[in-house]
């Protein structure tokens, strides 16, 4: 084990820790913000000589010499005993469709077992955690309640609490952290796209949210997870935080991330949000709105194998140049409902799970929103 290594290997670890510290200081010089993953000097001593599992996807990365390095690769190079990876929605490599079932597999690059936490199984079992001492959670969130990584973190925390395992969350800024808006989730509407009584946009980082899960006793039987958050340094939630990578296959840029809390409602309507195009969550339309000039045609592509209205021309709106939002904007949802010919079939059965209650649907139907 690392703590029992000879002096020469201890020196190597010391050098590596300080090398990563230099990288972090360079990041501070660039934008004055240090995120959790960059603070190797804080979390590496907590995991040396321990068996580690990691909950991550493609967003678990940092930049060194203008190159992106994944957390798993970084820790393996530091001789950390990474035993397995738990994968959330979209998979470990982040290239699977929304809602697509993920199966257990072996990562071809590292040879590590990948255990799915999306599909029939959403929570690590006691067997999964056998001989695991610590779990590290590092996934980029976008600050919207229906983004399922929060629910994955909830169940990981619950499993850690049940099996007396420490959880380390490497915190990351929230790109929609500059506002709080939307109805608080009602108990009868809770599901995997919303497990907690919070607004749609909650303004917290994922590390802050993890602390709230513990503090509010939201885990089963009021369990408490042994939680350590590697916090962000020099984070200002009122400043725009631009991601340098897609947090998921259908959020390709900052505009889509900013529009996502306002457009995700359409996922439970007949309206396309551009899945199967290059403008995901930046356009809306259906084949039946022929009075609109703008059009797009969804096609099957990686991350959107069977998009809504596949191969049909959809007419609607291009929202690429909409002003940056600091609130949820319902005007597009209301407009879509007014333009829908078959209003009885506009809202699908799962709409209330996205909205957080059944009231919003009724208000729109009655013209009260």
Regions found by a protein language model. Name each.
Residues 279-369:
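Conserved functional hotspot residues or short segments at active or partner-binding sites
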Residues 233-310:
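Glycine-rich, aromatic-lined ligand/substrate-binding cores of catalytic
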Residues 103-132, 144:
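Glycine-rich oxoanion-binding loops at beta->alpha junctions
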Residues 190-262:
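Conserved anion/nucleotide-ligand pocket segment
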């Amino acid at each position: 084990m690392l703590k029992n290594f000879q002096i020469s290997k201890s020196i190597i670890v010391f050098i590596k820790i300080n090398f990563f510290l230099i990288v972090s200081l360079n990041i501070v010089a660039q934008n004055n913000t240090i995120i959790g993953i960059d603070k190797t000097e804080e979390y590496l001593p907590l995991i040396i000589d321990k068996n580690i599992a990691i909950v991550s996807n493609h967003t678990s990365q940092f930049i060194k010499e203008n190159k992106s390095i994944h957390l798993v690769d970084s820790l393996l190079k530091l001789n950390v005993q990474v035993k397995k990876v738990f994968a959330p929605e979209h998979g470990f490599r982040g290239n699977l469709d929304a809602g697509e079932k993920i199966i257990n597999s072996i990562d071809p690059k590292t040879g590590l077992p990948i255990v799915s936490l999306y599909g029939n199984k959403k929570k690590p079992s006691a067997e999964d955690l056998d001989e695991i001492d610590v779990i590290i959670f590092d996934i980029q969130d976008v600050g919207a309640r229906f983004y399922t990584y929060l629910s994955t973190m909830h169940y990981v925390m619950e499993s850690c609490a049940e099996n007396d395992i420490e959880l380390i969350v490497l915190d990351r800024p929230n790109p929609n952290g500059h506002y709080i808006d939307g109805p608080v989730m009602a108990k009868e509407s809770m599901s995997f796209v919303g497990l907690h009584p919070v607004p749609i946009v909650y303004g917290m980082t994922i590390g802050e949210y993890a602390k709230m899960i513990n503090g509010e006793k939201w885990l089963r039987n009021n369990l408490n997870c042994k939680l350590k958050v590697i916090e962000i340094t020099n984070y200002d939630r009122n400043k725009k935080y631009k991601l340098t990578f897609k947090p998921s296959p259908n959020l390709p840029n900052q505009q889509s991330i900013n529009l996502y809390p306002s457009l995700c409602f359409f996922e439970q309507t007949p309206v396309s949000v551009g899945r199967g195009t290059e403008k995901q969550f930046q356009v809306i339309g259906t084949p039946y709105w022929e009075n609109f000039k703008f059009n797009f045609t969804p096609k099957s592509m990686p991350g959107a194998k069977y998009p809504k209205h596949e191969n049909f021309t959809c007419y609607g709106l291009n929202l690429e140049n909409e002003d940056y939002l600091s609130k949820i904007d319902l005007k597009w949802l209301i407009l879509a409902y007014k333009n829908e010919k078959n209003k009885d079939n506009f809202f699908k059965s799962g709409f209330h799970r996205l909205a957080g209650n059944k009231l919003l649907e009724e208000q729109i139907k009655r013209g009260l929103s």
